[in-house]
Amino acid sequence: MAFHEYPVTQDYRISRKVLGVGINGKVVECEHRQSGDKFALKVLRDTQKARREVELHVMASGHGHVVSVHDVYKNSYNGVDCLLVVMENMKGGELFNRIQERGQKAFTEREAAGIVNEICSAVAHLHRMSIAHRDLKPENLLYVTTASNAALKLTDFGFAKKTDESEPQGLKTACFTPYYCAPEVLGTEKYDKSCDLWSIGVIMYILLCGYPPFYSQHGQPMSPGMKAKIKSGQYTFPSPEWDCVSEAAKDLIRKLLRTEPTERITIEQTMEHKWISHYRRVPDTPLFTSSNLNDQREQWTDMQDEMEATLASMRVGPENIQIKSLGDSNNKLLAKRRKGGASPKDDPMDDIKEEEKDDEEEKMIS
């Protein structure tokens, strides 16, 4: 994988504006010195896992529904090697936040179908290259701009993995977000690209009603009851939210949420399903989604925090999966996020800023 080895600050001005926090690193805004264009900069410690993330993201880059990678740098700060990934700046925000911000404007089934079509387009692109994303969730689906017709794009390849002959053992490392993970991910079975289809089914379910099909009744990232529901495929289409949803939509959800991976619909079959292939003809029926997401805004934020904690602190054993609570997690990144601000300690971004500051001062002196 090719990358620049000279300082990123030669090409970009680095801002302290945090755009997001991924499982493997922080994302801040940066500005290209020559063009003045704004980009997103992700900082990763240079590890084999980070290189895999960057390599797969670069491979997938260029598709209309995948966040583009523009530059990659390898720099060292205080003796720590880092990869700095310059990406497209997604100014439109996260998928469900966009729906929450609609206010009284109705969100329709036709709009939901259009969104799922965009997500499926990105996943189909990955699967054609034998890449499983393995972390499909609303926070990783971002809009390019705030315009109503802005494109939705997939990002964060921190758990992505090749599924072809280069991975002879299959995907047997359990990387997942509880609310969106497939049953086979919860056990010791191997799993593959079909886990992405399960995640699409969960996202589609939430888009059509405003709440997830599987949840923890005790507010924990993964309760035994929630785990049992996922493994047995227990979910319903309750009234009144689902009374107005088309049978075609419910049919696709049933095919996506099948517990047996070999029986689950593929991404190609999903794209051919009439609810997706004819998404412009889907009924323009108003849904309860927007009001439910707003009514549960506080719970939704807590759920996102739980998912992030789980992603960063999961521990996989041969017989079971143990997930630390956020309070027990020793992950510094999550602790900073929970406290509402980043501590400057051990943050490569601060070293980058100091280096840039020194460069600017040298220019002023000379």
From Swiss-Prot:
Q: Which gene encodes it?
A: mak-2
Q: Where is this motif: Nuclear localization signal?
A: 330-353
Q: Where would I look for the motif Nuclear export signal in this sequence?
A: 301-317
UniProt keyword annotation of Kinase present: yes
GO biological process terms, semicolon-separated: behavioral response to nicotine; intracellular signal transduction; positive regulation of 3'-UTR-mediated mRNA stabilization; positive regulation of axon extension involved in regeneration; regulation of 3'-UTR-mediated mRNA stabilization; regulation of axon extension involved in axon guidance; regulation of presynapse assembly
The record's subcellular locations are: Perikaryon; Nucleus; Synapse
Active site per UniProt: 135 (proton acceptor)
Which reactions fall under this protein's catalytic activity? L-seryl-[protein] + ATP = O-phospho-L-seryl-[protein] + ADP + H(+); L-threonyl-[protein] + ATP = O-phospho-L-threonyl-[protein] + ADP + H(+)
Q: Give me the ranges of the annotated region Disordered.
A: 324-366
**Name listed for the protein in its UniProt record:** MAP kinase-activated protein kinase mak-2
GO CC annotations on file: cytoplasm; nucleus; perikaryon; synapse
Give binding positions for ATP.
19-27, 42
The knockout outcome noted for this protein's gene is:
Weak defect in the extension of body wall muscle connections or arms towards the ventral nerve cord. Double knockout with madd-3 suppresses the muscle arm extension defects, eva-1 expression defects and restores the defect in the recruitment of madd-4 to the muscle membrane in the madd-3 single knockout. Triple knockout with madd-3 and unc-54 results in paralysis (as in the unc-54 single knockout), and suppresses the lethality phenotype in the double madd-3 and unc-54 mutant.
Question: Which ranges are annotated Acidic residues under compositional bias?
Answer: 356-366
- What keyword terms does UniProt attach to this protein? ATP-binding, Kinase, Magnesium, Metal-binding, Nucleotide-binding, Nucleus, Phosphoprotein, Serine/threonine-protein kinase, Synapse, Transferase
Question: What binding partners and quaternary form does the record give?
Answer: Interacts with pmk-3.
Instruction: Give tissue specificity per the record.
Output: Expressed in pharynx, intestine and body wall muscles. Expressed in the nervous system.
Q: What Pfam families would the database entry show? A: Pkinase
The answer to whether the entry has keyword Kinase is yes
Comp. bias (Basic and acidic residues): 344-355
Give the E.C. number(s).
2.7.11.1
Q: What is the effect of changing residue 285 to E?
A: Phosphomimetic mutant. Defects in motor neuron presynaptic and PLM and ALM axon termination and increased cebp-1 mRNA levels. Localized exclusively to the cytoplasm
Q: PANTHER family, per this entry? A: SERINE/THREONINE-PROTEIN KINASE
Q: What is the effect of changing residue 173 to E?
A: Phosphomimetic mutant. Defects in motor neuron presynaptic and PLM and ALM axon termination and increased cebp-1 mRNA levels. Localized exclusively to the cytoplasm
